[in-house]
């Protein structure tokens, strides 16, 4: 090793300027060494801290690998191999953590500690001796200054002797401190070289020992394991690349569709509508009432499940029941100036929820699907075929054609028009020969009229002359007796749904078939507006009265009513057949279908009682017996129903507003 610079101890006593200049160089070197040593210690402490952190990190990593098994992943299929592999790696991490802990201890003992000792012992010693040398030099300078001021008079010899002794003591002290200081500075030149090498030797030995033990511990046992894990990862990568290619192809195919897939209601004129659905899914807007007059619309996901309409909000795990669709009715409605709205009503006719579809196609398919489900055809062996046949029949009801397919089976509705408490009647199949075919009841292609009963304003505009002409062709009050002279007066709130010509009035099946065709036509053609009227049943006539003007819109003689019946499932539907003479001498038959606010069987009961009154009016005794069997009002009129006030809501003048929505 090259020789180092040294301070000459022989020159310490003389303390010449040259010696002082050389001393300042050594002091500057010691100061630089002190700064560097502090920075070196910080770097080595950082390495030691990182190694300690590595110990803690590997320990935490080992625990986290074991925690994978306890995560209960929702999609945990095929994780068995991953779990076993992670368990093995956790064991490896524990062993590796032991090596890291040992390395951290070695770094602390052989790298960090020597630097700390060098700084605290050698550098601190030099700094202390520097301070002592400075104090001794100051004392020597003061004593020399005092000695230099001694006077020349002989009488001060004693003082001179004392000052001389003081100078000698100060000079001896300075000489001793300078010798110690010079020796420490000379020794520092050697110690700094060793102090720089020792920590690095300790660091290198620690790392070598760490890697050597690690190689001995893992080289043999880990080779086979790492090879198998590598093969497994590579196979997963191959599967991933293959799946990614498939997804890219699928993505390109899905994105290559036309713009119509993204644009709602792009084909408004001629949408491709499937009317044979027995299940349906999709987003709809649900109307919710938030106050007396305020509403909100919420977009939710709806789907049918058997005979139930289910709703599942976004983010929910499962759907909930919204409404039972069995025997319900669905019809388009005009709601808050929104398009594509429809309402689902309960089997009793009570209005239910209102929904909005996003397009005409979705709107009509939802209506058709709910109609199909409400008929419970999903319970049959081949519901798709039944749905196709039913919808073909519904289309034939409103489409002029020349031939019909024969019905495969018919249904018979049992009724008792005098029993107002009759409940829900099940559909019972009968022999096909005992029930008339559809062609025997209603001619194929018979048109259906939906606007025979005109609104009051239009009726008044057409009849501002001296005589009013009824839209049905009937004359006004001149031809019929006043209701005040009738023994029977019963009023019901009804809405006209449609009318059509029929071929026979020998069975109530013709009314049921007309109801089916009218409702099917309304659903297919999205006709939802109806005109509300008051149906006044007397012992002579049936009157349809405008609730706003109290003007009769139509009037039929009770004797011309040959059949009347209420629907056995939707109890608010009622219809009757009218026989009207023609100018040619023949008679025509027409069926009129209404929806009532009360049960249709009550209207049938009133009509039946009116016809009985007509029959017994010629026989005073029979009339008296009939009057005794029926409760009467104070003025002698018949009281038909206990809840008459509830059905009619009071006098006819109390009802205003001709338009309603079915």
From Swiss-Prot:
PH domain: residues covered: 277-375
Domain BAR: start-end pairs: 3-268
Record has S-adenosyl-L-methionine as a keyword: no
Lineage top rank: taxon: Eukaryota
Membrane topology note: Peripheral membrane protein
GO molecular function: identical protein binding; phosphatidylinositol binding; phosphatidylserine binding; protein homodimerization activity; protein-containing complex binding
A Pfam family matched in the record: PID
Primary location class: membrane
Subcellular location: Early endosome membrane; Nucleus; Cell membrane; Endosome membrane
Record function comment: Multifunctional adapter protein that binds to various membrane receptors, nuclear factors and signaling proteins to regulate many processes, such as cell proliferation, immune response, endosomal trafficking and cell metabolism. Regulates signaling pathway leading to cell proliferation through interaction with RAB5A and subunits of the NuRD/MeCP1 complex. Plays a role in immune response by modulating phagocytosis, inflammatory and innate immune responses.
Record text about domains: The BAR domain is necessary and sufficient for mediating homotypic and heterotypic interactions; associates with cytoplasmic membrane structures; mediates interaction with TBC1D1 and ADIPOR1. The PH and PID domains mediate phosphoinositide binding. The PID domain mediates phosphatidylserine binding and allows localization to cytosolic membrane structures and nucleus. The PH domain allows localization to the plasma membrane, cytosolic vesicles and distinct nuclear and perinuclear structures and is sufficient for RUVBL2 interaction.
Protein name, UniProt field: DCC-interacting protein 13-beta
Recorded name of the encoding gene: Appl2
